[in-house]
């Protein structure tokens, strides 16, 4: 009944939690990843993996206390997150086609592994698989294999 329904979507919900997540953005030169600890407040209504990707989409300029002169965004601004799903420790991320337009001055590896390494910082995620508008793409930026499952790559972290 309506009387027994509990609405916990209120912004003052006591179910809100805060987590510090290490996110990865591009170095100024664009060839390395820079680890940035980011505090994220969330509740049960939106999955943490979605919030983390949304922050990557916004870029580092929206994070308090972070100087964007040292780091840069890795995802094109007009990219849309269509869907994110977690199943059996694999995070499935579906972006719009704009994701394939690698930002100038950033290597393909840095663009992809900023998302992969950030998601794998979250509990229960060990692998990431990408799709574009619901379909598998074989290559990212016509150069890097993109159809496989990705695991963490710490070699790119400076």
Annotate the PLM regions:
Residues 1-158:
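Bimodal "functional hotspot" detector
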């Amino acid at each position: 009944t309506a009387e027994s329904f509990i609405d916990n979507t209120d912004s003052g919900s006591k179910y809100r939690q805060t987590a510090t997540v290490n996110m990865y953005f591009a170095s100024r030169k664009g060839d390395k990843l820079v680890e940035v600890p980011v505090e994220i407040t969330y509740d049960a209504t939106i999955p943490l993996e979605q919030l983390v990707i949304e922050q990557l989409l916004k870029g580092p300029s929206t994070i308090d206390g972070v100087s964007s002169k040292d780091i840069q965004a890795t995802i094109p601004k007009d990219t849309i997150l269509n869907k994110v799903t977690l199943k059996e420790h694999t995070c499935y991320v579906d972006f719009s086609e704009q994701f394939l337009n690698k930002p100038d001055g950033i290597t393909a590896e840095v663009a992809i592994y900023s998302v992969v390494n950030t998601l794998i910082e979250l509990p229960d995620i060990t692998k990431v698989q990408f799709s574009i508008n619901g379909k598998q793409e074989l290559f990212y930026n016509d150069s890097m294999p993109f159809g496989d499952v990705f695991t963490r790559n710490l070699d790119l972290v400076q």
